[in-house]
């Protein structure tokens, strides 16, 4: 009670995370030191406290204005958009720096004592303006972070706002306090006069201000008058009557109200980003593109959510829409349109409510649910042909274009004649011809540009002919050329022979580079035909006079550039692969060092034209900048080390990357001592001295770099000769193929063979993966990537480079991350500080290239014609590891050998009686005695000890199993401490452990010499102590440490050597004597294991042979037994909602009395006579108590058990009964009584079997209830099963001899304790799931607890097919069984049993566990375990003369499907029957006669009931509704492969659904067959029964109406009273309570509406809402409207 009062107090509620977070971020806004803070401190130090307070007040006011800009858009646009304040910021900063640079006079150093001082206004304005300009001059990262938090998270949270304001005030107060403290300390501690010190303070702050201004001046934004779009026209005013001349504006004027504010083609930023650097360590092969989707808040299901699919134009749409709503007071027209739209939607809402109420009333009168449901409306064309729907990828949960499947059946295949097929074929041919005529819009733009270029400048295309004057000039230039130049001679022959033969520009481009440059130079000088191959800038720049001449005559909208950018994003591949996309033209970007462009092609391939781009050494800075705001972003990015060599301005020095040398934790630990620190200092001084000696000046380094570049250029220039290119190209191609396919595979094979011979794990997969990762790319001579498979054109004349991406390096072994970390730590500990520092600096200088270039001799370079990379030796790590192993292990082994020999000498010299004791060793071994303690602690002592004691010894009937846990040991059923029973355990010679579930008989030995691998019975050295726990050798080695200093005489040394040799001989003889016993023991051990495996396999084969004789069973049975037995076996493991056991709900007094031994940990009684003993081993003892962890479990022998499977019950004792009362609630108990679980389970017997099966089909009862109600035939089969098991156990006991009982071993009986623990845990989990399912059994959307009854009744429509599938019989037997059920009077109302057999038909159980007698069959399958005896596969057997025609028909339909407008996609359950039906239609068309249709159906095994569905209109419509899905195809405007977020998130979201779909598809494929479709007409007629309580009321509406209803309800005010509708539904509930349906148990109620607010992840609903309610019809618009499809309700 006190706790509740304490929680109700207001002060704990104030301590909210929002409050702490707001206070933290408010405090952080004042921490960064910028120009405004520096000026405030300067005012305190120079002008005193009043001056500082005035400066702080100006800064505080500016910060308040900046924070308020979050809620006021004009202030936000004024402050945070740099283009508007650029003109003010830069001049003001320069002026301020120039003013404060020089010291004016001493007036400024006097303190401010009054507010009337002229300096007050100046100080206030300076601090104010610098704080306002702070986001531009010095971007505050913390303030920016706070702004984003306001926007996206806490903008409406009052607690957060107040706490932020308090934190901000605290920060300002702290800043004021510390500034005053600094002033007092400077005044008090100044060694000189404070007035003189002010001069130094003034100079210091002037230097700081100037450095800030200079450093951030280079980051100033682009000026306001910058023109970013060169070809963008200017808007101008016009009259209203001129609008009719422009169709686009006129169309926009008459748009509906919400969509008139939306412009889908307007983009806020660019869509592409291209890297400038060609040779880079992280170079990629594809151009990267930024995503077009951004984050935005949305309102879904009444909650604000953050969506990642918002387009940039969404913000424009929302802004304009809300502005129009806000201006409703001023504009009557806008307010009227908005009110009209809302009133229409509210009227539609009332109509929907009335329609839903009428449908509910129809259900009350007794109408069927199928007739009451709303029907879908479709548009119909001529001859009642339905117009297909457009394919909507969002509605069907697909984001990609779906190819047409080859197994789906077209609607046209069902009823078209031959002449209709011919007509359809001609129509499709005409349609294809029209499609070929169409040209893409982007191609039109490119060709128009090209024609405009051609008319303006005369740039020819490659296939255009040369003009006559150009031909004459060509003939004049190359008339006297040598005859061996065949290309020139061919062109000259064409010009000489006849003037009609055309010479194209392509032939000119095929000439040598010098020839066509010479020809084009003459053309440029002679002004005959201007062509821009010498100066691309003149050729491709557009004249501004012509392009802007007609600007004022026409109006261009701003979204034209946006349209072009969207088209480019859509046709990126087409645009960049086109031959006319010439770099340097009017495109989006231009290369930095582009010199000229040429067109090349491969011989014999006229379509392989490629643009060859050649680059200059100096960048072309006349190129056009990127469109958009990329320049400002590029200016604010950090300049990485790879780009620092290009820095030429002091403004960028602050952004340069600086290397940070840090010392790791391991290095600190290794240099912790004082001596090591002094040594480190000495080494550092030596290193600095050497560095000064070897230091090279910066100019010298630059000269060296320049010389290396010049050297590479010289080598490339000398190699740029035709014959050299020829030989070099062939050598490079040979080296590439040799390395990839011969050298590396051979080395990998040899390495793995060597590892296998050295007994190491093979690394074939890792090496082969690295080999596959290596890619060879053919490049041009200048290093530009061309292709991976094809060689570049003219590679023998112009040269080639081969680029190796991810080069493979063979290593002796592959190390994991952990091993690498350990090796690095070892290296850090071993290597000194000097080498460590040198290595770190060397690593910083090195760049790990992901690609290299191949040389002629097979070496690799980082760049073309660069320095050869040094290859790491393969044997170097091997040599290092061998040296390391030798250094570590060899001295230790030598020392141990020396100590061992020395201890032997000492032992012999001290113990003179040793020979007499050692001679008794052989006699003790022959008499069967024990070995000495030297062998007691060996790991393989069971091989070294003598086994003569166990050869003829029989096992005792009652053996005590000893286990230790918590210092207690159980002996003979009594618990005693470990120290009391120590002596008794030591003297015990033999202990045999035998557990009946999974423990094997273990070799008897001394427990002190054994480590038991059992989690519950571990005997450690702490619990049990022995008198002699160490070996003799260890004692002797330890004793030599104290006796090493004693001298040994020569006689004693000789005697000790003699005794040592004698002892070694005796040891060798004893080993030879023990060798036969050891071999015999090993043989017996493995023989018993093989015997256990053989008996287990024999039992499995016998069960399989029984299953093979199932089909020979008598066919007279109408109710087949194996299906019921499968249900009987699997019922224990399967329950409602996955795994639910109703053991606690069984009201059976007989079962409660037969409880087993108590398990104190889990509170469960387990009697092991039930099904859980199916996996027991075949040898038992009468009574074997086992004690572990203070738990006693008792196992009974099979002699006590009867031949039947006894009851297996689980009950709770008095102690656990208390926990039951805690878990069981009164509501749960009342629900159990209302549902009637206890009564129904008590009334079950053999007579009312069908009634029980009908009522409790989804529940999982124990075997006691099953045995009470099972038929007599089941019990007979069950007794046969138990007798078979008993016979198997006795046969196995006879086969195993009693003398080998102690060494019995089985691979199936390991760790019984672990198995028992898992089984008990599963039982506890099932009981816990029981309570959870009883309390949480209501599904999402249910109000009454009727989900279980509804799920039972939903199985009515497919139970026939399930039972027919599980009966394992033919069609005759199925029909007889159905006839038997229909003729039975008692089960007339239960015609369709509610049995969900889908999960019970487990193939592994249904195929192996057969409870029949053994009958052998002559012919069996290869794998009987996977054979299905009851599944029928209908294979179509068609003769060869029909097969060829059938294939032709299938090929024809595949071609027709590609152009199909819409198709009927059959569900996956009916694909098997669909294929037969399809073949029937194809053969009917081929024969052209339908008279002999029944015979044809019989031959191809097609059910004749399918034909009835064709002629029955009602069933045909229902069949198409239930078995097919209508779909059509529509192209997307934005491809999914261009959406980065989609590629990241979509596979994760759909992975679980795909797995679930695959599992469900496999399950239904085994259960459903052709009989389901044959009984479809019967099922459809039986659905007319009154089952309205099984459905949700919102299912009465169509999906489209439901989506509209949801949207319209969001428009209503949240204060609407729903009492009227709730009262109506309650009246309906009361009326339904009075009815009593014969097929449902009580209670019976109709579910209430609770699922109108659908889940927020259904994004496709927004698309439908946008189309139907808002009037948006195009795809791009509903993509954006799905984020903000509901307006925010106004409170």
Curated annotation (Swiss-Prot):
GO BP: protein transport
Transmembrane segments: 19-39, 60-80, 84-104, 123-143, 158-178, 200-220
Chain residue ranges for the region called Disordered: 819-839
Domain of life, per lineage: Eukaryota
GO cellular component terms, A-Z: chloroplast inner membrane
Topology within the bilayer: Multi-pass membrane protein
Subcellular location: Plastid, Chloroplast inner membrane
Keywords: Chloroplast, Membrane, Plastid, Plastid inner membrane, Protein transport, Transmembrane, Transmembrane helix, Transport
Family affiliation: Belongs to the TIC214 family.
Assembly information from the UniProt record: Part of the Tic complex.
Name of the protein this chain belongs to: Protein TIC 214
Record gene name: TIC214
């Amino acid at each position: 009670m006190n706790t509740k009062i304490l929680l109700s107090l207001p002060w704990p509620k104030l301590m909210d995370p929002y409050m702490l977070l707001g206070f933290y971020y408010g405090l952080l806004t004042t921490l960064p030191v910028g120009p405004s803070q520096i000026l405030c401190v300067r005012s305190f130090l120079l002008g005193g406290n009043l001056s500082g307070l005035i400066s702080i007040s100006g800064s505080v006011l500016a910060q308040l204005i900046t924070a308020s800009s979050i809620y006021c858009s004009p202030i936000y646009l004024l402050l945070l958009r740099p283009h508007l304040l650029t003109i003010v910021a830069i001049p003001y900063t320069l002026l301020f720096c120039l003013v404060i640079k020089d010291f004016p006079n001493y007036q400024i150093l006097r303190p401010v004592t009054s507010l009337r001082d002229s300096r007050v206004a100046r100080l206030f304005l300076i601090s104010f303006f610098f704080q306002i300009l702070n986001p531009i001059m010095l971007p505050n990262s913390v303030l920016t972070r706070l702004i984003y938090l306001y926007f996206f998270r806490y903008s409406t949270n009052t607690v957060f706002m107040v706490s932020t304001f308090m934190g901000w005030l605290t920060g300002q107060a702290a800043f004021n306090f510390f500034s005053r403290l600094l002033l007092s300390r400077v005044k008090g501690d100044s060694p000189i006069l404070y007035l003189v010190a002010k001069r130094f303070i003034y100079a210091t702050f002037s230097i700081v201000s100037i450095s800030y201004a200079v450093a951030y001046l280079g980051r100033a934004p682009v000026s306001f008058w910058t023109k970013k779009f060169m070809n963008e026209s200017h808007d101008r005013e016009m009259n209203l009557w001129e609008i009719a001349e422009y169709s686009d504006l006129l169309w926009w004027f008459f748009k509906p109200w919400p969509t008139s504010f939306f412009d889908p083609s307007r983009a806020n930023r660019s869509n592409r980003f291209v890297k400038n650097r060609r040779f880079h360590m992280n170079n990629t092969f594809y151009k990267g593109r930024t995503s077009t989707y951004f984050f935005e808040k949305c309102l879904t299901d009444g909650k604000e959510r953050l969506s990642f699919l918002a387009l940039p134009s969404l913000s424009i749409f929302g802004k304009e829409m809300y502005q129009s709503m806000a201006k409703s007071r001023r504009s009557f027209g806008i307010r009227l349109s908005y009110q009209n739209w809302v009133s229409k939607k509210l009227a539609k809402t009332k109509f929907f409510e009335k329609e839903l109420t009428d449908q509910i009333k129809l259900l009350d009168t007794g109408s069927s649910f199928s007739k009451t449901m709303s029907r879908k409306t479709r548009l119909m064309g001529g001859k009642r042909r339905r117009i297909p729907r457009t394919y909507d990828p969002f509605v069907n949960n697909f984001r990609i274009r779906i190819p047409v499947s080859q197994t789906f059946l077209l609607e046209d295949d069902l009823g078209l004649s031959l002449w209709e097929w011919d007509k359809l074929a001609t129509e499709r041919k005409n349609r294809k011809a029209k499609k070929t005529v169409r040209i893409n819009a982007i191609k039109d733009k490119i060709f128009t540009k090209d024609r405009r270029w051609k008319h303006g400048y005369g740039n020819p295309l490659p296939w255009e002919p040369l003009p006559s004057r150009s031909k004459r000039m060509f003939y004049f230039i190359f008339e006297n050329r040598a005859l061996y130049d065949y290309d020139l001679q061919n062109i000259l022959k064409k010009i000489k022979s006849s003037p009609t033969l055309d010479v194209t520009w392509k032939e000119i481009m095929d000439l040598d580079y010098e020839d066509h440059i010479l020809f084009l130079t003459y053309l440029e000088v002679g002004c005959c035909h201007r062509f821009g191959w010498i100066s691309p800038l003149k050729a491709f720049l557009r004249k501004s006079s012509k392009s802007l001449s007609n600007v004022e005559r026409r109006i261009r909208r701003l979204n034209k550039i946006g349209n072009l950018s969207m088209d480019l994003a859509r046709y990126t591949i087409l645009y960049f692969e086109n031959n006319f996309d010439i770099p340097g033209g009017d495109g989006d970007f231009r290369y930095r060092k582009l010199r000229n462009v040429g067109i090349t092609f491969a011989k014999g391939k006229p379509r392989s034209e490629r643009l060859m781009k050649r680059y200059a050494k100096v960048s072309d800075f006349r190129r056009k900048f990127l469109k958009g705001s990329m320049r400002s972003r590029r200016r604010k990015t950090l300049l990485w080390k790879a780009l620092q060599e290009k820095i030429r301005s002091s403004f960028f020095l602050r952004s340069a990357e600086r290397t940070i040398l840090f010392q790791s934790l391991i290095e600190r630990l290794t240099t912790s001592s004082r001596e090591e620190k002094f040594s480190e200092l000495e080494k550092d001084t030596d290193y600095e001295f050497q560095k000064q000696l070897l230091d090279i000046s910066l100019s010298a380094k630059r000269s060296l770099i320049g010389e290396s570049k010049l050297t590479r250029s010289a080598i490339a220039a000398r190699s740029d000769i035709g014959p050299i290119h020829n030989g070099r190209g062939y050598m490079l191609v040979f080296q590439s193929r040799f390395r990839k396919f011969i050298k590396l595979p051979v080395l990998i094979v040899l390495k793995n063979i060597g590892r296998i011979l050295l007994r190491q794990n093979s690394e074939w997969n890792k090496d082969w993966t690295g080999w596959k990762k290596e890619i060879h790319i053919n490049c041009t001579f200048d290093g530009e990537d061309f292709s991976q498979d094809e060689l570049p054109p003219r590679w023998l004349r112009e040269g080639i480079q081969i680029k190796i991406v991810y080069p493979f390096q063979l290593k002796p072994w592959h190390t994991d991350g952990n091993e690498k970390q350990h090796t690095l730590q070892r290296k850090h500990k071993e290597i000194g500080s000097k080498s460590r520092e040198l290595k770190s600096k060397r690593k910083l200088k090195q760049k790990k290239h992901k690609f290299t270039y191949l040389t002629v001799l097979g070496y690799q370079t980082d760049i073309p014609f660069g320095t050869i990379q040094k290859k790491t030796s393969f044997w170097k790590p091997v040599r290092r590891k061998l040296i390391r192993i030798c250094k570590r292990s060899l001295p230790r082994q030598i020392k141990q050998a020396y100590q061992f020999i020395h201890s032997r000498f000492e032992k012999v010299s001290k113990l003179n009686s040793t020979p007499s004791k050692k001679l008794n060793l052989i006699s003790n071994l022959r008499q069967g005695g024990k070995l000495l303690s030297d062998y007691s602690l060996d790991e393989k002592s069971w091989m070294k000890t003598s086994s003569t004691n166990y050869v003829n010894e029989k096992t005792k009937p009652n053996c005590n199993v000893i286990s230790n846990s918590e210092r207690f040991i159980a002996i003979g059923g009594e618990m005693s401490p470990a120290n009391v029973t120590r002596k008794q355990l030591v003297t015990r010679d033999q202990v045999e452990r035998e557990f009946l579930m999974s423990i094997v008989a273990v070799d008897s030995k001394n427990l002190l010499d054994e480590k038991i691998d059992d989690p519950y019975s571990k005997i450690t050295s702490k619990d049990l102590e022995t008198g002699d726990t160490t070996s003799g050798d260890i004692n002797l080695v330890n004793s030599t440490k104290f006796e090493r200093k004693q001298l040994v005489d020569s006689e004693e040394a000789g005697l000790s050597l003699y005794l040592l040799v004698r002892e070694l001989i005796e040891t060798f003889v004893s080993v030879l004597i023990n060798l036969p016993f050891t071999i015999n023991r090993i043989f017996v051990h493995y023989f018993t294991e093989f015997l256990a495996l053989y008996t287990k396999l024999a039992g499995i084969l016998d069960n399989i042979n029984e299953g093979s004789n199932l089909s020979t069973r008598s066919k007279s049975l109408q109710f087949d037994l194996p299906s019921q037995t499968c249900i009987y076996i699997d019922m224990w493991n399967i329950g409602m909602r996955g795994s639910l056991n109703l053991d606690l709900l069984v009201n059976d007094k007989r079962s409660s009395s037969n409880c087993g031994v108590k398990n104190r940990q889990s509170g469960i009684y387990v009697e092991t006579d039930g099904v859980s003993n199916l996996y027991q081993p075949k040898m038992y003892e009468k009574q074997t108590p086992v004690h572990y962890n203070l738990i006693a479990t008792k196992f009974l022998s099979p002699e006590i058990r009867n031949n039947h499977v006894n009851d297996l019950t689980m009950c709770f004792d008095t102690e656990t009964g208390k926990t039951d009362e805690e878990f069981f609630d009164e509501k749960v108990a009342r629900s159990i009584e209302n549902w009637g679980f206890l009564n129904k389970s008590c009334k079950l017997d053999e007579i009312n079997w069908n009634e029980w099966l009908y009522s409790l089909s989804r529940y999982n009862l124990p075997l006691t209830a099953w045995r009470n109600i099972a038929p007599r035939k089941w019990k007979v089969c069950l007794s046969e099963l138990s007798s078979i098991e008993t016979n198997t156990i006795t046969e196995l006991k006879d086969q195993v001899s009693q003398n080998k009982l102690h060494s019995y071993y089985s691979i199936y009986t390991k760790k019984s304790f672990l198995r028992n623990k898992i089984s008990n845990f599963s039982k506890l989990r099932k009981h816990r799931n029981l309570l959870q399912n009883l309390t949480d059994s209501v599904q999402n959307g249910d109000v009454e607890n009727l989900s279980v009854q509804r799920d039972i009744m939903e199985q009515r429509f497919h139970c026939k097919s399930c039972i027919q599938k599980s009966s394992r019989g033919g069609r005759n037997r199925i029909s007889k069984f159905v006839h038997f059920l229909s003729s039975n009077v008692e089960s007339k109302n239960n015609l369709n049993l509610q049995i969900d057999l889908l999960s019970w038909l487990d193939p592994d159980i249904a195929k192996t566990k057969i409870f029949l007698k053994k009958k052998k069959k002559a012919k069996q399958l290869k794998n009987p375990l996977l054979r299905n005896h009851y599944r029928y596969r209908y294979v179509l057997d068609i003769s060869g003369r029909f097969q060829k025609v059938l294939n032709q028909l299938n090929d024809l339909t595949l071609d027709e499907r590609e152009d199909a407008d819409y198709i009927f996609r059959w569900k996956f359950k009916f694909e098997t029957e669909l294929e037969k039906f399809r073949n029937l239609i194809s053969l009917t068309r081929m024969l052209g006669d339908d008279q002999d249709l029944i015979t044809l159906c019989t031959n191809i095994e097609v059910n004749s009931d399918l034909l009835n569905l064709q002629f029955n209109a009602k069933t045909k419509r229902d069949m198409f509704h239930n078995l097919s899905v209508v779909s059509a195809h529509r192209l997307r405007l934005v491809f999914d492969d261009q959406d980065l977020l989609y590629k990241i998130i979509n596979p994760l979201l759909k992975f679980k659904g795909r797995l679930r779909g695959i599992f469900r598809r496999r399950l239904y494929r085994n259960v459903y067959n052709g009989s389901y479709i044959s009984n479809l007409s019967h099922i459809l007629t039986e659905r007319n029964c009154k089952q309205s309580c099984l459905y949700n009321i919102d299912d009465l509406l169509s999906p489209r109406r439901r989506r509209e209803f949801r949207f319209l309800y969001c428009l209503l005010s949240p204060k609407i009273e729903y009492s009227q509708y709730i009262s109506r539904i309650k009246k309906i509930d009361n009326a339904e309570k009075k009815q009593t349906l014969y097929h449902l148990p009580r209670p019976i109620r109709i579910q209430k509406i609770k699922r109108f607010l659908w889940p927020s992840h259904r994004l496709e609903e927004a698309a439908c809402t946008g189309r139907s309610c808002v009037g948006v019809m195009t795809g791009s618009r509903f993509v954006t409207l799905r984020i903000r499809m509901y307006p925010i309700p106004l409170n």
